[in-house]
Amino acid sequence: MTKHGKRIRGIQEKYDFTKPYSLGEAIDILKQCPAVRFDQTVDVSVKLGIDPRKSDQQIRGSVSLPHGTGKVLRILVFAAGDKAAEAIEAGADFVGSDDLVEKIKGGWVDFDVAVATPDMMREVGKLGKVLGPRNLMPTPKSGTVTTDVVKAIAELRKGKIEFKADRAGVCNVGVAKLSFDSAQIKENIEALCAALVKAKPATAKGQYLVNFTISSTMGPGVTVDTRELIAL
């Protein structure tokens, strides 16, 4: 067994992963996991008490994390004319219109988030089968369909992220790097949790935050006590 494997096993023997921990305790457990050669991402997986088959219970939105994600985003902007020039000036990594649409149709998706001006959505909408499954489709609800491309780019650079429940009612979101201070990780997770609670559909009945787990890229999943999160 490798040294990394032995340390993971030591963590697993020290803690009971069948029980929930407070958010602070869960973060501390991740921090105790063995170091690797890269800065691991802290991921959140939330099972929501919704029925995604119902149109009024499909969860999708965005939230600005107070400390960002620690990830340098590759931002693509669908725009033409003056708006394209604004996007370039604002630091977008890829800017274009029909040329980008055709490139993506060919299978290219080497970017992390897409922004589009409203006039581009007729063409961008044709990319649904490519962008949709990858959560890359711009939407008004997430603020990525907008005439103010400069503001959208700035917000994304500062740590604005999107969240979306899948067909099983689960949201999976990267919220920080493990190198962040514990307090920074905690505040980012609390911001996401508050946004999820705010997005709760009026028609959703019963327990809303069914299961809440945090993990690092190479570490174990730690269940967080949802009673603490609901009380935020």
From Swiss-Prot:
Keywords: Repressor, Ribonucleoprotein, Ribosomal protein, RNA-binding, rRNA-binding, Translation regulation, tRNA-binding. One of its GO terms (molecular function) is tRNA binding. GO terms for cellular component: large ribosomal subunit. The keyword Repressor applies. Pfam families: Ribosomal_L1. GO terms for biological process: regulation of translation; translation. Coiled coil: none annotated. Part of the 50S ribosomal subunit. Binds directly to 23S rRNA. The L1 stalk is quite mobile in the ribosome, and is involved in E site tRNA release. Belongs to the universal ribosomal protein uL1 family. This is Large ribosomal subunit protein uL1.
